[in-house]
Amino acid sequence: MKRTIFLAALLALALVSACQSREQQYVGKAVRLMDKYGLFAEGPSWEQTRAAALEAKPATMDEAYEITRTALKVAGGKHSFLWTVDSQNKSAVEDAGTEPSVTRLEGDVLHIVIPAFSGQSTDENRRYIHTVLDKLPEAAAGVVIDLRGNTGGNMYPMIAAVHRFLPDDVILKFKGRRFTTQVSRSFVLRTVGIEAQPAIDCPVALLTDSLTASSGEALLLCFRGLDNVRSFGAPTAGYASANSPHPMPDGSQLVLTQSCDQARTGEVFCDDPIAPDEPTDQPLEAALAWLRSR
């Protein structure tokens, strides 16, 4: 009897899907993903938005995209977006990226620029990481890690590039609706496939601006709460959250925010900018002055 009821329910679901247009099926799948993974997919606002999306009758894929985007902003917040095939192709052409760099400033102070990075392949990751690691000395009097303009991307190569300045423990947490995930330094290194190098014990200054976002903010928070660390510059962009891409039938990606960033201090960050320890319009000069005093 139970089996009969179950089969009947499956048949009814199949009939409903068969009666829906391609555009309605697209919206339906997007809403199901938001229901399951969306950081803010709960409460009256989401229920109202969800119902409106499912009741809509999009006639074109552009209309389906717009309905999906409207729902996405409620379920996932400002860090979520719909990445269409056209957008992906344009991004692939534009995403040449900037190389990280290591230079010596006064004395034995290092200046490490960690730019945005969206690479995913092993070769791309290792090239980015070793551009920094291969230029680091055995010791330093201090280091300036420059995150200005780092709009995000793949955080693991960024963290791995400066792992010698981080402790070998949990460096960040992701706090979702139903879960909290810990990120350790060793996990990051395993993910990118490199061996840990000896620690460099020195004061760390971090530079931020209004473009420091997403993975750039995550890297900033990896240092939050550590002794002998100070940040300088301007408040960040306020995208301190983690999102994941979910493939859609037409090749687009539903990039959905699933968790907020949590520092070792217990502080949870998400849509609000992260203020620097020392606000200044001359962050490099201020950082060097602080390092001289250590």
Language-model regions, residue ranges each:
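A short, well-ordered alpha-helical element
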Residues: S121-A141
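Short, glycine-/small-residue-enriched flexible loop/hinge segments at domain edges that mediate gating
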Residues: A140-M155
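Terminal peptide-recognition signature
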Residues: A30, A71, I112, I145, ...
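Bacterial N-terminal signal peptides
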Residues: A8-A14
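STAS-typified acidic loop motif
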Residues: E99-R127
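Bacterial Sec-dependent signal peptides at the C-terminal "C-region" and cleavage site
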Residues: L15-R22
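Extended, small/polar residue-biased N-terminal targeting/export presequences
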Residues: L39-G107
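Gly/Ser/Thr-rich loop/hinge elements
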Residues: G152-A205, S241-G251, Q258-Q262, V268
